[in-house]
Amino acid sequence: MTIYGQVPSKSNGYRIITIRGHGSLAKTKELKEYEANFALQYKRHNKILGNFEVEVDVYFRSNRSDLDGMFKVFLDCLQKVEAIDNDRYCMKITARKFVDKLNPRLEFKIYETGNTEQEDIREKKKGEGKEVEE
């Protein structure tokens, strides 16, 4: 699957704000726009409820961006569009970095890993009356 647009890094995606005298993190306008763009482009597949692996090719506008800064944003977007149940179930990420000044994007594949926990989670959600995609 391909998602077009420059992935904001974690460090550029959040800003510190003060709420009732305490510091907190808030999403930047750039990150909010990227999440909305990701959701519009994402083609729905069955939701992965347990462990998974991801292969991702990241095409940045320049060589200045780094891979590790984009993983949180990418996994959070997958969770937000309900491609995955929770990013904590990510067991492996295989990533490659490229530069494409004119067409920044993500190209990725998500694989469910074979585990019995997967079926346990599905059955638990069904028992709780939650909708589960098959």
Predicted segments with their positions:
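Acidic, proline/glycine-enriched N-terminal capping motif
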Residues: 1-134
